[in-house]
């Protein structure tokens, strides 16, 4: 491994200090996002189902989908972005696929995800 690669890994490790809970596709999460309106800054909660997750160190990202006024809204977040204040897992979902894009075509009861029950 070259010095350049080691240096990049060291810098990325320094920036990845945020505590991120373990979550995956199918989980319902609440993301607290910093929103700047004019001169003030406030926190906005974005609650939805994780439909994809990309683990790439500092470049990790995840996509959250929610239904707002009957319309599906998806938003992609960078996991270690300074705009993401916190991530809270509300409910664990039991899915078999890593990317659950099939939820885009579904609505109503067919878009529901079974809850993952804790093992005894």
From Swiss-Prot:
GO CC annotations, alphabetized: cytosolic large ribosomal subunit
Sections of the chain in a coiled coil: none
Recorded GO MF terms: structural constituent of ribosome
Annotated keywords: Ribonucleoprotein, Ribosomal protein
Highest rank taxon of the organism: Bacteria
Keyword Ribonucleoprotein: yes
GO BP, one annotated term: translation
Gene3D superfamilies, per database record: 2.30.30.790
Signal peptide residues on this chain, from the entry's feature table: none
InterPro entries: Ribosomal_bL19, Ribosomal_bL19_CS, Ribosomal_bL19_sf, Translation_prot_SH3-like_sf
Family: Belongs to the bacterial ribosomal protein bL19 family.
Biological role: This protein is located at the 30S-50S ribosomal subunit interface and may play a role in the structure and function of the aminoacyl-tRNA binding site.
Record-linked NCBIfam families: rplS_bact (TIGR01024)
Protein name: Large ribosomal subunit protein bL19
Organism of derivation: Marinomonas sp. (strain MWYL1)
């Amino acid at each position: 491994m070259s010095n350049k690669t080691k240096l990049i890994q060291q810098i990325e490790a320094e920036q990845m200090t945020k505590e991120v809970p373990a979550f995956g596709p199918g989980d319902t999460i609440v993301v607290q996002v910093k929103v700047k309106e004019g001169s003030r800054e406030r926190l906005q909660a974005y609650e939805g189902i994780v439909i994809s997750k990309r683990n790439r160190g500092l470049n990790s990202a995840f996509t959250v989908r929610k239904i707002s006024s009957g319309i599906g809204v998806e938003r992609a977040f960078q996991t270690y972005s300074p705009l993401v204040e916190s991530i809270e897992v509300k409910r664990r979902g039991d899915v078999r696929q890593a990317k659950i894009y099939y939820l885009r075509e579904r609505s109503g009861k067919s878009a529901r995800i079974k809850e993952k029950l804790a093992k005894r």
